[in-house]
């Protein structure tokens, strides 16, 4: 995979997965609403292009996109950009399946529950990183301050994910 487009990229889970791909050297771009999000600064920090709104024209202008990942928000699979990508034969995955795809060759640590998922996932990723385990991680937050990003592809065998 050389290029991934995210529909709803500003959501915390989507941003963390986008940054995972970015850290692998994959070209990342996406679209979302104009509203300010806690992830705006992180996307800007890594120079990830975010188009405003959702229109089939965004998909028509993409060059060599290998995969489109969409969120359940913004009409999910019925989003006009997702519909256009499908009509052009671009592979499309919802966020959860895309995260599973990224994790499938790793030893997986998924944090689930009703309270504390983000904090616990971030703590696990931080401890493993500082212990020299070089984990991959995708945590739904604006930033994991000790690590500098809510998502990254590490060189170790572990993948830490916040499970929704």
Stretches found by the model and what they are:
Residues 20, 59-61, 76-164:
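Phosphate-binding loop of NTP-binding sites
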Residues 1-98:
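N-terminal leader/targeting and accessory segments in enzymes
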């Amino acid at each position: 995979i050389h290029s991934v487009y995210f529909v709803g990229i500003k959501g915390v889970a989507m941003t963390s997965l986008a940054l995972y791909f970015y850290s692998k050297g994959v070209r990342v771009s996406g679209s979302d609403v104009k509203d300010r999000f806690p992830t705006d600064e992180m996307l800007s920090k890594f120079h990830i292009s975010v188009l405003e709104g959702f229109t089939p024209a965004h998909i028509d202008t993409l060059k060599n996109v290998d995969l489109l990942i969409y969120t359940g928000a913004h009409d999910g699979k019925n989003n006009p950009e997702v519909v256009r990508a499908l009509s052009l034969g671009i592979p499309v995955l919802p966020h959860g399946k895309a995260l599973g795809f990224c994790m499938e060759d790793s030893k997986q640590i998924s944090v689930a529950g009703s309270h504390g998922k983000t904090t616990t996932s971030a703590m696990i990723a931080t401890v493993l990183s500082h212990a020299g385990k070089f984990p991959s991680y995708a945590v739904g937050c604006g930033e994991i301050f000790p690590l500098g990003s809510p998502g990254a592809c590490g060189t170790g065998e572990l993948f830490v994910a916040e499970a929704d």
